[in-house]
């Protein structure tokens, strides 16, 4: 349509009269020809886009937008098998997108990456706290800390395998692999250390309780790492006031900074500050909203 109007408008300028331009069958034919060519090109580009992305290892905004409708089979299966993880992922996506945009990173890519970052949890959903309903016994009570850690860490490997099997764009794989970096699974490490101390055994080996990594390689993956941790931790606050959330966000970012988790992604200190401010605002709003809903029920 645009091509037709452009060619026909040029004809009007030459003819100096709209009626004369309409009577000029040659001009109309040229306009229609250019319109048809443009339409065919659009179809060819749209049809070949998946092959281009796969060949060059890129993902376009068009493909990402198609994944924002959360109708992908993997997300539908995640919602069915691990509803707590699904809800967590949706909240993390909203937080991470805003934080990424606050530093000029790719918010859309970060949002879609957040949708899929925890898909591996659907393989053993009952072992993740967000899927353990009230009144249900925590399965970790009957497991040694080392075994619990292997299960928790395993969701990253499971997620990458699911991504491969379901042909998720390569650009989304790092969000699955890197969202925990090489961080420590602190709860089970402390449990192992406590048991080792009470049994008068040697100290627990910290390396056995760390994710294998890699650490975030991009700013987008680093943003997701922080947003993921903030959303999970904020749900444990009895009274999620603005001040408590601010302190929580600051502590999470500082801990990961000192642990070297941002060393490979070129994040600047002023960007970390903007990420912190964005997550403060978004977390406060989300927790306030949830508190209101809970109160109403």
Model feature map: region roles:
Residues 2-4, 27-33, 69-70, 109-119, ...:
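A glycine-rich phosphate-binding loop feature that marks nucleotide/adenosyl-phosphate handling sites
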Residues 75-88, 93-242, 246, 255, ...:
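Divalent metal-dependent catalytic cores for phosphoryl transfer on phosphate-bearing substrates
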């Amino acid at each position: 349509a645009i091509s037709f109007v452009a060619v026909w408008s040029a004809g009007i300028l030459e003819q100096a009269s709209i009626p004369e331009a309409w009577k000029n069958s040659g001009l109309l034919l040229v306009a229609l020809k250019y319109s048809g060519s443009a339409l065919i090109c659009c179809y060819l580009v749209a049809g070949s886009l998946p092959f281009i992305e796969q060949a060059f290892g890129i993902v376009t905004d068009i493909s990402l937008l198609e994944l924002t409708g959360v109708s992908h089979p993997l997300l539908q299966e995640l919602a069915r098998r691990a509803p707590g993880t699904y809800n967590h992922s949706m909240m993390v996506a909203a937080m991470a997108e805003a934080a990424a945009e606050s530093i000029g990173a790719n918010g859309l890519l970060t949002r879609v990456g957040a949708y899929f970052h925890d898909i591996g949890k659907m393989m053993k959903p009952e072992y993740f706290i967000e899927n353990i309903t009230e009144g249900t016994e925590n399965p970790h009570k009957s497991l040694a800390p080392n075994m619990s850690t292997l299960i928790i860490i395993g969701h990253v490997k499971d997620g990458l395998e699911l991504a491969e099997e379901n042909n998720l764009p390569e650009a989304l794989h790092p969000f699955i692999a890197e969202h925990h970096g090489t961080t420590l699974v602190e709860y089970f490490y402390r449990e192992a250390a406590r048991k080792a101390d009470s049994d008068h055994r040697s100290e627990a080996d910290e390396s056995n309780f760390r994710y294998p990594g890699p650490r975030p390689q991009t700013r987008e993956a680093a943003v997701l790492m922080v947003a993921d941790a903030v959303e999970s931790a904020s749900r444990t606050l009895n009274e999620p006031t603005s001040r408590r959330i601010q302190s929580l966000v600051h502590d999470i970012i500082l801990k990961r900074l000192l642990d070297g988790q941002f060393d490979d992604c070129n994040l600047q200190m002023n960007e970390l500050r903007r990420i912190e401010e964005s997550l403060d605002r978004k977390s406060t709003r989300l927790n306030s909203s949830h508190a209101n809903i809970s109160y109403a029920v």
